[in-house]
């Protein structure tokens, strides 16, 4: 996979996904996908209700396309899933958004794709919960036809000092080759550098 020509799909355009999409889209062909039409309409007007991304950053994201249509994700090489994982009344994570995002990606991803998760999860979740959904809906085999990665989101909403580009970021992949691609990709937009974890589970525990 040639990193300079990679096509990205960012799933979820909240306070994590939008800044990520905006930074990547300065350099890469990027589709920002969200299921909320009103969110997409506001972003097309250059308005970010989370206030995490400035109008200048949105204007600079010259290769960013906003979409709520999964068909626009069919030619993507790398997906980055940034949907929320809220907790329920018993403080247990609600993985429903993660399951739905994995289903969306599984239905459109092509052989050779890499799916990176940033959503906050427990160690083991990516490979135990998300991978079977990706396999089910794609008909592809994990670590043969497609690969995964995990990079824990590190941004605190409203913190203008420790922003996406100047923090350091942990990365990981399901094979050494996938880990290399994921680490290289994030390294392009991060001034704070990256740290490659030994496995997805180690990155999830970080």
Regions found by a protein language model. Name each.
Residues 1-206:
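Structural/interface elements that position substrates and couple domains in central-metabolism enzymes
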């Amino acid at each position: 996979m040639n990193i300079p020509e990679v096509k990205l799909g960012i799933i979820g355009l909240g306070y994590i996904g939008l800044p990520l999409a905006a930074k990547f889209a300065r350099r890469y062909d990027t589709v920002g996908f969200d299921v909320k039409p009103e969110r997409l309409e506001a972003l097309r007007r250059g308005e970010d209700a989370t206030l995490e991304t400035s109008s200048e950053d949105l204007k600079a994201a010259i290769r960013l396309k906003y979409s709520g249509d999964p068909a626009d994700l069919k030619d993507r090489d790398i997906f980055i899933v940034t949907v929320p994982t809220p907790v329920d009344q018993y403080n247990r994570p609600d993985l429903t958004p993660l399951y739905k995002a994995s289903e969306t990606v599984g239905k459109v991803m092509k052989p050779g794709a890499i799916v990176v998760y940033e959503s906050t999860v427990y160690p083991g979740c990516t490979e135990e919960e998300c991978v079977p959904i990706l396999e089910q809906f794609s008909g592809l085999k994990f670590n043969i036809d497609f690969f995964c990665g995990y990079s824990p989101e590190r941004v605190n909403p409203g913190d203008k000092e420790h922003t996406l580009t100047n923090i350091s970021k942990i990365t990981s992949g399901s094979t050494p080759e996938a880990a290399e691609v994921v680490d290289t990709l994030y390294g392009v937009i991060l001034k704070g550098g990256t740290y490659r974890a030994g496995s997805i589970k180690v990155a999830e525990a970080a």
